Amino acid sequence: MFIKIHSGAISGIEAVEVSVEVNVAGGGIGLFIVGLPDNTIKESEQRIQAAYENSGYRLLAKKIVVNLAPADLRKEGSLYDLPIAVGILVATEQLTSKFIEDSMFIGELSLNGELRGVKGVLPLVAMARARGLKRVFMPKENVAEGAVVEGVEIIGVSSLVELCEILSERMPYTPAEHVISSVDMAEESLYAEDFADVKGQAYVKRALEIAAAGGHNIIMIGSPGSGKTMLARRMPTIMPPMTLDEALETTKIHSVAGKIGAHRGLILERPFRAPHHLTSQVALIGGGTYPQPGEVSLANNGVLFLDEMPEFGRNVLEVLRQPLEDRHITISRAKYSVDYPANFTLIASMNPCPCGYYNHPTKECTCSAASVHRYMSHISGPLMDRIDIHVEVTPVSIKDMSSERREESSADVRCRVVSARELQRQRFEGLDIHCNAMMNSSMLRRFAPLTKECSELLERAMQRLNLSARAYDRIIKVARTIADLEAKESIEPQHLSEAIGYRSLDRENWGR
């Protein structure tokens, strides 16, 4: 007897349809799984056999061939345990059900027949809906994630026995309630941190506000204990709330990476990823024998924070250049390649020198000019070229620390950021960009033209401050964002002056 069960496989952050074809015939005994399975799938024979024995079913002494089609697509993971087990039961006439043809099955079987959660559920359910399937059977711990997708019934089961009872219509089922319609995308109480927690540092907070408003990458240079990490961790709290599309994309990435905990659904808060400086290239950009998303993709639609940036290996930092420029990462293997989104805001921090006290107001730096220069050279020019804002962070004074003055909250800053982003959305409507940081040179001439006064100001600054040529476009982009924060139609001299002040590391005399 032949039977076909619907399932799926993950490719990048999307899913493709996989048919689990089961054929039972004479002429031998055994279970044979074909169709480019990995070792996890090959081991499913033992899990399925034990689950049958502990659930009251039998693996008949016949030749059972399971084909995972299409055969040229690599399949991996334990999510095929359930569709294979159901297919064998139907093909051996131990189970009959009218639900098979229009249902998808995903889940890992334990030896006692219970179901365990799997990763990649959200893209799999989205694919099931696109294929016109009516329902998806899955482990209960994945239900909250699956219920993000509307238009398909999500049915959580705890064991093989419970599933068979439902399929045989001996037990009623209640589909999970879909969560999208009840989600408030503008919810502001998602974060525990707040800008109001940080005393002083108005100059740095202003720079972070500009970075959030225009999607600009930013680097903070300051001595140890000046508050760089504390400020960086509060960046997501002032960024605009994620749109539904952004939330779905973010959830898909974390789902594929297996980073969504049990019983968790749509991710609403912007990601904040802070990899250790010993992180490898693969961990940072993604990869592996079977590619998985790296930190740059897990930070998609959020923040990637590189604390003490010069401590990262130079080869590790250099691989950031492609995702910073293209906002996605391509991982190639011999026979295929996968793309992962990598549209993140980079926040980097660093000490100004090896000892950490160059330009400190009270402590003396013990580093030579040459050692400061060598330390700064750990970050290459092409990588620094992709960072729009450089801001020096000075230690908070005792006066500011003891002040009772109420600091501005993240909600207040976010209101201005959202207004500026709305202006940019209108400006770039119909284009494939959505914020000022994404403009190229031709777009700058169109959307951020300079008056004669501003052009002369920028030219004088380039000469007097010895700014490098690569700073020119960056300054204009940041100035355009500053103008947006003030709801100004054109860039004015004060906007340009402030933007020029955010190019500390471009000055040729830095560290000398």
Predicted regions and their residues:
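Walker B catalytic acidic pair
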Residues: 301, 307-308, 319
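Walker A/P-loop
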Residues: 220-261, 326
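Short loop/turn elements that form and flank the Walker-type P-loop nucleotide-binding site
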Residues: 59-62, 99-100, 132, 150, ...
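P-loop NTPase nucleotide-binding/switch module
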Residues: 171-210, 214, 241-296
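Peripheral, non-AAA+ core regions of ATP-driven protein-machinery
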Residues: 1-219, 223, 332, 472, ...
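Basic, amphipathic alpha-helical bundle interface domains used for macromolecular binding and assembly
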Residues: 40-45, 58-60, 67-77, 290-291, ...
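Catalytic P-loop NTPase motifs of RecA-like helicase/translocase cores
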Residues: 112, 306-313, 356
